[in-house]
């Protein structure tokens, strides 16, 4: 069962068919491009409706469940895997992997290097976080706790501009599904992403990629270059940090995508 049937999930749908597997796809859009593939079973269900997805999974007696290129269905994947005794991640791990506040707390507790951060649920907490960075004379970045693709991200490089500070809060909050945002120290340096595959708790590095973004203040991804041009000793350290991060949030089986700033 593959959660999501958009163009982003299409390669997985086709690969699974190629392997001779019976593919069940789930998407709330009855016109999703993945539903047009021949020989697949289509279930028109929201990928975050874990209860209905579980019903469909039991109906089809599935042997595996996955998603890709989408954060939101991870909780559904975890719930179905647990209920049906399939290989997968736990619901807590799904939360750790898709909520920046939860993730940073896990990384901090495990000693993985991360910037100073604050989980913010209200305007008062936001003002307290901003006061910390004003006192420390550090740039900070504001982002929704539970979104992706650089949505709602804003850099605050001038903490004397109260209008900019207020606007960043409203902008980031508007992209937060649960209402929480993260305010964290802005780290200077090139950004890389690390693709890994974990098997029985062992994290294997697949590729390190240099990321190309628009830069401040929104950091929208524009492209990628692989393999990374970083020096070998830096790539070794990147691999160590990525592996530690994957283990810290609880991923024991499956692929992971980790983003790291080299400082």
Residue ranges of model-derived segments:
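Short catalytic-loop micro-motif centered on adjacent basic/acidic residues
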Residues: 2, 64-67, 115-118, 155, ...
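Phosphate-binding core of ATP-grasp and ATP-grasp-like enzymes
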Residues: 171-180, 185-228, 236-263
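Short hydrophobic patches on amphipathic alpha-helices
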Residues: 57, 130-133, 246
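Hydrophobic residues in well-ordered beta-strands that form the structural core
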Residues: 25, 88-90, 116, 141-142, ...
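ATP-binding N-terminal substructure of ATP-dependent carboxylate-amine bond-forming enzymes
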Residues: 1-93, 124
């Amino acid at each position: 069962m593959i959660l999501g049937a958009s163009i982003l999930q299409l390669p997985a749908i086709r690969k699974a068919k190629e392997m001779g597997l019976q593919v069940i796809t789930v998407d709330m859009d009855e016109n999703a491009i993945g539903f047009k593939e021949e020989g697949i079973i289509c279930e028109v269900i929201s990928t975050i409706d874990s209860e209905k997805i579980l019903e469909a999974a039991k109906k089809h007696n599935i042997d595996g469940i996955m998603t890709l290129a989408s954060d939101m269905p991870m909780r559904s994947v975890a719930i179905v895997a647990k209920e049906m005794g399939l290989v997968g991640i736990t619901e807590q791990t799904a939360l750790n992997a898709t909520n920046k506040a939860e993730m940073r707390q896990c990384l901090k507790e495990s000693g993985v290097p991360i910037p100073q951060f604050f989980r913010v649920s209200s305007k008062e907490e936001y003002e307290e976080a901003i006061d910390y960075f004003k006192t420390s004379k550090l740039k900070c970045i504001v982002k929704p706790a539970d979104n992706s693709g650089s949505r709602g991200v804003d850099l605050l490089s001038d903490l004397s501009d109260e209008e900019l500070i207020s606007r960043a809060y409203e902008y980031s909050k508007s992209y937060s599904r649960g209402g929480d945002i993260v305010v964290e120290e802005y780290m200077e340096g090139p950004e890389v992403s690390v693709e890994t595959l974990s098997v029985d708790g062992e994290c294997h590095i697949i590729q390190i990629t240099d990321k190309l973004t628009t830069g401040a203040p929104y950091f929208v991804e524009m492209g990628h270059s692989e393999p990374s041009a970083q020096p070998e000793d830096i790539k070794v350290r990147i691999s160590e940090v990525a592996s530690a991060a994957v283990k810290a949030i609880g991923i024991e089986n499956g692929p992971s995508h980790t983003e790291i700033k080299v400082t």
